Structures are given as structure tokens and as C-alpha cells.
Amino acid sequence: MDPNTVSSFQVDCFLWHVRKRVADQELGDAPFLDRLRRDQKSLKGRGSTLGLDIETATRAGKQIVERILKEESDEALKMTMASVPASRYLTDMTLEEMSRDWFMLRPKQKVAGPLCIRMDQAIMDKDIILKANFSVIFDRLETLILLRAFTEEGAIVGEISPLPSLPGHTDEDVKNAIGVLIGGLEWNDNTVRVSETLQRFAWRSSNENGRPPLTPKQKREMAGTIRSEV
């Protein structure tokens, strides 16, 4: 196993532990708590994939961080922080909408690269909006935290989430997954639109009807997925 993979996991475990202590002291805001909950699932998946114990990894990560901090000067820390571009966290959904449990009458699930797409095939003839919480850097979608499909009544009927065992995805991965979800929902005569915020930062454009400008390749993939998966 690559030692850098192990050390990266160890440091991530320790930093999650520190963030959890911050949350326990009620010092974290809603985006902070969102990321904490999602990262916990990701770490469990990575630990299972790597065959590493999280508690042991956390202790090892603490030693790595302590060693680095002893070597780090305040001036070097300031320069490092100044050179790193800051990402923004955008929220279409409230904390309640993100954390709410939901179930499917006719469940369908598909893995598209590092993302998992879930939808309820029992939903028909509904107006649906896709909302997402995600981070943005350089005015472009950086990391999807969670996307959910809501009916006008507020019911959750679909979802796109990162796979804990496959961390890391691109904006193209997200757009392709959205295309698959839209196609699956429209197969049952639902009308689907995407939130203006998500359109703006994923596609850098927005349409009044809420439809993102899917590429011909995405349309072909969407159509093929509908025929074979839904």
C-alpha cells in the first residue's frame, strides 16, 4: 500500500477528530456540521477499503500533525494560507432538508463514477426541483456535498451523493450524474428543473425553465442509462 495513502488517511482522521471536538463545543455553523457528517461517512468507507482502524489512524495522524506544527513557523503559516485559494460553501438546502430521512416505494440506484444516484421510480407527473449544497472555487463547482430532488410538496424523491469509498470527483462527474437523474425522473413524465445556483456554478449559465445545457454526449449517456437502468 502506498505510504502516502496511509498517512493522508491518518491525518484526515485526526483532523476530523479535532473538528468533532469543535462541534461538541457548539462552535460550528451549519456548513461546518454538514461537512463533518459527510466526512465521517467518507472516512468509514476509506478505512474499510484500506483495511485500517480509524482509532489507530487518528492517533498516528495526531503524531504527524504535532511534528509538522513543531517545525512550522508563524510566518510560514501566514504565507501558506495566503497562497491557497479560498473556496465558498453554497447551500440550496437547509440543514433539515439535508439530514431528513426518506424512503422509496420503487427504489432505483446507480453508481456513476464516484457518485451514487438514487431515485424513486414510483413518482409520476410531478414538478420536481433539484437542490444541492456544494463548494465553489474560482466560480466553479468544486465539491458536491449532497444533491436532492424535491417535489412541490417538499417530498424527497431522488438524491446524488459522493461515494465514501471513492473520494474526489469533478464538476463533469456531477453534471453527468445530474443528467442521469433528470432522465430517470422524466421517464415517468415528471417535470424537472435545476436550481439557479447549481446551474450557475456547474454550467456557468442558467435557463428560465431550469434546464441545464446538457452536451450531446451527456444526452446520449442519459438516454442509454434510462433504457438499461430505469
Swiss-Prot record:
It holds the Pfam family Flu_NS1. GO terms for cellular component: host cell cytoplasm; host cell nucleus. Residues 223-230 are annotated as: PABPN1-binding. A motif (Nuclear localization signal) lies at residues 34-38. Keywords: Eukaryotic host gene expression shutoff by virus, Host cytoplasm, Host gene expression shutoff by virus, Host mRNA suppression by virus, Host nucleus, Host-virus interaction, Inhibition of host innate immune response by virus, Inhibition of host interferon signaling pathway by virus, Inhibition of host PKR by virus, Inhibition of host pre-mRNA processing by virus, Inhibition of host RIG-I by virus, Inhibition of host RLR pathway by virus, Interferon antiviral system evasion, RNA-binding, Ubl conjugation, Viral immunoevasion. InterPro entries: NS1, NS1A, NS1A_effect_dom-like_sf, uS15_NS1_RNA-bd_sf. SUPFAM superfamilies: Ns1 effector domain-like, S15/NS1 RNA-binding domain. Residues 218-230 have a biased composition (Basic and acidic residues). Residues 180-215 are annotated as: CPSF4-binding. A motif (Nuclear export signal) lies at residues 137-146. Upon interferon induction, ISGylated via host HERC5; this results in the impairment of NS1 interaction with RNA targets due to its inability to form homodimers and to interact with host EIF2AK2/PKR. The keyword NAD does not apply. One of its GO terms (molecular function) is RNA binding. One of its GO terms (biological process) is symbiont-mediated suppression of host gene expression. It is found in: Host nucleus; Host cytoplasm. Homodimer. Interacts with host TRIM25 (via coiled coil); this interaction specifically inhibits TRIM25 multimerization and TRIM25-mediated RIGI CARD ubiquitination. Interacts with human EIF2AK2/PKR, CPSF4, IVNS1ABP and PABPN1. Belongs to the influenza A viruses NS1 family. Inhibits post-transcriptional processing of cellular pre-mRNA, by binding and inhibiting two cellular proteins that are required for the 3'-end processing of cellular pre-mRNAs: the 30 kDa cleavage and polyadenylation specificity factor/CPSF4 and the poly(A)-binding protein 2/PABPN1. In turn, unprocessed 3' end pre-mRNAs accumulate in the host nucleus and are no longer exported to the cytoplasm. Cellular protein synthesis is thereby shut off very early after virus infection. HAMAP family: INFV_NS1. This is Non-structural protein 1.
